[in-house]
C-alpha cells in the first residue's frame, strides 16, 4: 500500500498540474474532464486519504506533528467537499472553475505532504509502516 500511496501522490500531482493548465486555456476542455476527475477523487484519492488518516497520520501524531496532521485532514475534507460540489454542479455552474479549485488544492496538498510532512518520519518509521501494511494486507487476503 505504501508504494501505491506514493504512486497516487504522483498521479494526483500530474493530474492537478494538467487540469489547472487546461482550466486556464479552455473551459470546455476542463469541463470535459469532470467525470474522470470525480472517478479519481472518489476512487484512488479516497483510498489514499483513508490510508493516510488511519496509518500515516497516527505515526506523524506520535512525532508531535498533530497541528500539521490537522491541516492535512482539513485539506482532505476540503477536497471531498469540492468533489461533492463538482458532482452536483448544474449546467449553469462554472465547472471549469471548480476543476481549477480542485487542481489547485490537490497540488497544494501533495506538496504539503511530500515536502513537509512525510520527511518527518524516520527510515525506521517507514519500515514499521511497511511491515504493518504487509501484515494487514495478508490478513485481508482470503
Task: Please place each PLM-identified region on the residue numbering.
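Small-residue-biased structural context
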Residues: 1-142
Amino acid at each position: 500500500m505504501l508504494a501505491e500511496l506514493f504512486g497516487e501522490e504522483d498521479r494526483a500531482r500530474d493530474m492537478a498540474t494538467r487540469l489547472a493548465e487546461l482550466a486556464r486555456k479552455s473551459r470546455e476542455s476542463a469541463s470535459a474532464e469532470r467525470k474522470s476527475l470525480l472517478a479519481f477523487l472518489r476512487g484512488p484519492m479516497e483510498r489514499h486519504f483513508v490510508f493516510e488518516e488511519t496509518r500515516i497520520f497516527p505515526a506523524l501524531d506520535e512525532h508531535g506533528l498533530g497541528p500539521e496532521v490537522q491541516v492535512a485532514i482539513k485539506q482532505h475534507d476540503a477536497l471531498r467537499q469540492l468533489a461533492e460540489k463538482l458532482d452536483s454542479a448544474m449546467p449553469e455552474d462554472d465547472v471549469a472553475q471548480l476543476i481549477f479549485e480542485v487542481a489547485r488544492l490537490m497540488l497544494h496538498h501533495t506538496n504539503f505532504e511530500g515536502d513537509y510532512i512525510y520527511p518527518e518520519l524516520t527510515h525506521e518509521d517507514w519500515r514499521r509502516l511497511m511491515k504493518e501494511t504487509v501484515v494487514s494486507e495478508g490478513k485481508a487476503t482470503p
